[in-house]
């Protein structure tokens, strides 16, 4: 109860900071003349440094200190988000976003590895789902918060500048608090009873895959497990990021409702995704099964996306299908439990970084490809078909990954 609620709050803060540009873009285009191309490149350039530093960030948590790493990254990204309020030129925006990506790179893979330091395998997917449920909830909360801030102009300063400042400062404060709240290992937790520390440490030691711990990048890239996980993450993230960035526009075009009503309707799919993620993570732990709990939400989303192709224009039906499509995010808890269970500690840390890096590339590619198809065809149907195929492929690939019972205990990487 001490760690998960706090990590949950940290991840909400992370996503609010990461997506602040999406809400600030309207004001930036008006006040400093940034074109859609500039804003699009500014958004995408974030992922260049973010992807490049995924593996080093994850390994720092394993080999240095999760507490120090998480604290430092939060203070850094909070400061950089706040400083983005000072941009006046495209080059300043590009620099701010590039450095922000570098600052955030180690947080997510670091937390996934950190959870494996604390939670035994039968609790790991539930812990991951409780942490990652912050993603849909951040979108539920972020839109009204950003809208309220953008509507104000305190001390003659534009609302979009205040948005960066006010969403960056909580990360700085929470980063400092994290240094004192988090503990690297159960054996170091003075707030646990001695018997609790001993029990958790012993259970985690018993679950460790055996064999050598040192690994190389070459071993990672040659591992069938890592290749499958990376391909699955790319395909799933491709579809998921399309839903994240295009959902408001899809609702607006399909319904013709006001922006305010679209904003309220847009929260419904993320509420559904939030509930689905918690239930799927809980059920995965209860049954000790990961692959099907990763695949089924993706298959459900694919069916919903195919339904959107034949959509007759009904707003309620649109919301229902988009809600079930957003269930694709329920794939995450069981999926991220796989590398921490079938690989050794150092292999899992490097793999989480590598897989998340590959998946994050889709954060730029997915929304861009979907927008390109819409611009060329004038219809969302081709984009829905594309991401439905990607989602189906992700579901089938994750079923090919080795299960916990299939791992080779003498090897740091599954073959």
Task: Annotate each language-model stretch with its function.
Residues 33, 65, 86-92, 103, ...:
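Helix-breaking motifs and short loop linkers at transmembrane-helix boundaries and internal kinks
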Residues 290-338:
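C-terminal transmembrane helical hairpin of 12-TM major facilitator-type secondary transporters
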Residues 2-36, 142, 243-248:
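Extracytoplasmic
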Residues 126-147, 170-171, 356-366:
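Glycine-rich segments within core transmembrane alpha-helices of 12-TM secondary carriers
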Residues 52-91:
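Conserved MFS/SLC helix-loop-helix module at the cytosolic interface between two early adjacent transmembrane helices
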Residues 63-74, 285-298:
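Cytoplasmic membrane-interface "Motif A"-like loop-to-helix N-cap segments
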Residues 96-133:
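Cytoplasmic helix-loop-helix junction between adjacent transmembrane helices
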Residues 21-22, 218-278, 332, 336:
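Extracytoplasmic gate region of multi-pass secondary transporters
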């Amino acid at each position: 109860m001490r760690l998960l609620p706090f990590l949950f709050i940290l991840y909400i803060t992370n996503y609010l900071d990461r997506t602040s540009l999406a809400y600030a873009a309207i004001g930036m285009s008006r006040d400093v003349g940034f074109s859609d191309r500039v804003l699009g490149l500014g958004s995408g350039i974030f992922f260049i440094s973010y992807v490049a530093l995924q593996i080093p960030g994850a390994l720092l948590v394993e080999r240095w200190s999760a507490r120090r790493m998480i604290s430092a990254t939060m203070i850094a990204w909070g400061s950089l988000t706040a400083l983005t309020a000072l941009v006046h030129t495209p080059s300043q925006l590009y620099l701010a976003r590039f450095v922000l990506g570098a600052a955030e790179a180690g947080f997510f893979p670091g937390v996934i590895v950190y959870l494996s330091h604390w939670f035994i395998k039968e609790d790991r997917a539930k812990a991951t789902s409780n942490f990652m449920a912050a993603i849909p909830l951040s979108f539920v909360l972020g839109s009204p918060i950003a809208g309220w801030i953008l509507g104000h102009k305190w001390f003659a300063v534009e609302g979009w500048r205040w948005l960066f400042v006010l969403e960056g400062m909580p990360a700085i404060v929470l980063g400092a608090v994290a240094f004192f709240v988090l503990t690297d290992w159960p054996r170091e937790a003075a707030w646990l009873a001695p018997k609790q520390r001993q029990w958790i440490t012993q259970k985690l030691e018993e679950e460790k895959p055996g064999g050598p711990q040192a690994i190389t990048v070459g071993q990672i890239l040659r591992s069938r497990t890592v290749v499958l996980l990376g391909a699955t993450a790319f395909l799933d993230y491709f579809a998921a990021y399309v839903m994240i960035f295009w959902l408001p526009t899809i609702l607006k075009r399909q319904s013709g409702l006001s922006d305010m009503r679209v904003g309220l309707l847009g929260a419904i799919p993320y509420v559904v995704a939030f509930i689905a993620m918690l239930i799927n993570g809980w059920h995965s732990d209860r049954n000790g099964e990961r692959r099907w709990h990763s695949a089924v939400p993706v298959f459900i989303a694919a069916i919903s996306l195919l339904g959107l192709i034949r959509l007759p224009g009904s707003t309620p039906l649109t919301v229902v299908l988009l809600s079930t499509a957003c269930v694709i995010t329920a794939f995450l808890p069981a999926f991220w439990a796989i590398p921490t269970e079938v690989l050794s500690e150092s292999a899992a840390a490097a793999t989480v970084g590598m897989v998340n890096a590959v998946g994050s590339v889709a954060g730029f590619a997915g929304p861009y490809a979907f927008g390109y198809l819409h611009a060329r065809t004038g219809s969302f149907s081709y984009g829905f078909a594309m991401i439905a195929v990607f989602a189906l492929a992700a579901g089938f690939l994750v079923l090919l990954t080795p299960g916990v019972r299939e791992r080779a205990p003498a090897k740091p990487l599954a073959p």
